Every structure is written in structure tokens, then in C-alpha cells.
Regions:
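Radical SAM enzyme core and accessory elements
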Residues: 171-181
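Conserved AdoMet/S-adenosylmethionine-binding subsite of the radical SAM
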Residues: 1-140
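A local structural micro-motif
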Residues: 19, 167-168
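Charged, amphipathic alpha-helical interaction segments
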Residues: 73-76, 160, 164, 172
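Conserved N-terminal glycine/acidic-rich loop preference
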Residues: 85-88, 94, 134-166
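Conserved beta-strand termini and adjacent loop/short-helix elements that scaffold enzyme active sites
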Residues: 128, 169-172
Length: 181
């Protein structure tokens, strides 16, 4: 991490003008994020779960939501509201991604409610429908399937009912192994 910080600092000192994007699981220590202050223009964290039961089961991190809440607060403190250039390109801000998982739309609604009630229009919320069950999902029959359109739409409509207007949604069939990073 220190090598990346040093390289970014040097690049910015030498006139780097493109935005620096920090892609994250959301499970970050605030102390680490503070080292990046002034170097990162756009934070792109996940916010995977609100439920400690789900985060313990699927990510072995029962404290995921508490860690992610603290990390997100630091990210937003550093970047402020999302700012775009004249062509609509994001220049600074935080875009929080949430992957809606099959069978857990209530947890997704809890995530969206937390994000919107806490940050309103300071952040953009990206609701993703691309959950793809990989071979290990066979160990968890409840998530060993793709997300239905009904489940995803229910979360999207819930976000809209809260007043979320700044964000991104996915249309169509995006759950293919060919698009998994």
C-alpha cells in the first residue's frame, strides 16, 4: 500500500490529471483510507450486506457492515458530493455498489435505506443485478441460482420510493460468467 501511495503522490505532483479511482470491497480500515487522502478522486466501494449473519456466512466477516459504514463515512468525508465535468464524466465523489443477491432482497433494501438515509444525494448508489452462482455456491443452495427480475426490480422500486435519484441500475441479462472480473 505504501508503494502505491508514494507512486500516486509522485504522479499527482508531476501533473496527473485523470481521476484516480479506488475500487474496494468496502471492508476497509479508516486508518488505511486516511493515508489515501488527497490521492484518490473517486471511491468505488461495495456495500455487500447489512446483516451480520449474512456477512459471517458468505464472507466470514460478521463485522462487515460496521466496518463498511466507517469506511464509507471516511470516503465521503474525503471526496464530498459527486462532481462531474461538462461531458458528464465523474471527477470526484463516491459511488457505492450493491450486488443484489437472490433470496435476500430485504437485506438489499436495508442497505439502500441506510445509504440513502445517511448520505442522501452525496453519493451515487449502483444497484447491480449480475449475481452469478459460481461452483462454490453449490455449498449454499439458497444462493445457488441467478437473481430474478422480480427480486431486482423490487429493490430498484424500493430505492425509488425512498427518493433515490442519483445512481445506476442495470438492465437486461448481465449475470454471465463472461463479465465476471
Amino acid at each position: 500500500a505504501l508503494q502505491i501511495i508514494e507512486a500516486l503522490s509522485r504522479a499527482k505532483d508531476n501533473g496527473l490529471v485523470i481521476p484516480v479511482v479506488y475500487n474496494s470491497s468496502g471492508y476497509e480500515h479508516v486508518k488505511t483510507l486516511r493515508l489515501l487522502e488527497g490521492l484518490v478522486d473517486i471511491y468505488l466501494p461495495d456495500f455487500k450486506y447489512m446483516s451480520p449473519i449474512l456477512s459471517a456466512k458468505y464472507s466470514h466477516a460478521p463485522d462487515y457492515s460496521e466496518m463498511a459504514k466507517k469506511a464509507l463515512a471516511e470516503m465521503v468525508r474525503q471526496t464530498g458530493e459527486c462532481r462531474f465535468d461538462e461531458s458528464g464524466m465523474l471527477k470526484k465523489g463516491t459511488v457505492v455498489r450493491h450486488l443484489v443477491m437472490p433470496g435476500y432482497i430485504k437485506d438489499s433494501m436495508n442497505v439502500v435505506e441506510y445509504l440513502y438515509s445517511t448520505y442522501k444525494d452525496q453519493i451515487y448508489i449502483s444497484l447491480m443485478n449480475q449475481y452469478t452462482p459460481l461452483p462454490r455456491a453449490a455449498d449454499y443452495p439458497e444462493i445457488n441460482r441467478r437473481l430474478t427480475t422480480y427480486e431486482y426490480d423490487k429493490v430498484v422500486f424500493y430505492a425509488l420510493s425512498l427518493g433515490v435519484t442519483d445512481g445506476y441500475i442495470q438492465k437486461g441479462k448481465t449475470a454471465k460468467e463472461s463479465i465476471i472480473p
